[in-house]
Amino acid sequence: MITLKRAYDSVSPTDGRRFLVERLWPRGVSKAKLRVDTWLKDVGPSTELRKWFSHDPVKWSEFRRRYFRELSSQPEAWRPIVSAARRGRATLVYSSHDTHHNSAVALQEFLRKSSRRPAKFKRTSAAHRPRSSLP
């Protein structure tokens, strides 16, 4: 299960594994108060995308589309969240004041959709398979 929580809200034992999912540390929050298990800077939207969006709800649909494209190109950035969620609860920690239009909400949606998609495997022809070291 993947849940969301603002960085300014109290930590709870039911949060499970806590991931800060932004490139920037939340203003005015100490490491001791935030108590995240992992800071996944690279899972946050690119600086260019974050600045373009600027938490403008009018841009929400286009932001999601662009952010999903970024996430699709870097699965290694968000795999730790999926792994933690399979073992229990994972909480995405974010700092935005808007609880409906922020990158953590979009990330949660992306991860839910990704978990429903079947894995894609690329078939390798015999000519391109690595050679075995066996005779």
Please name every model-derived segment.
Residues M1-P135:
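Residues lining hydrophobic/aromatic ligand-binding pockets adjacent to catalytic sites
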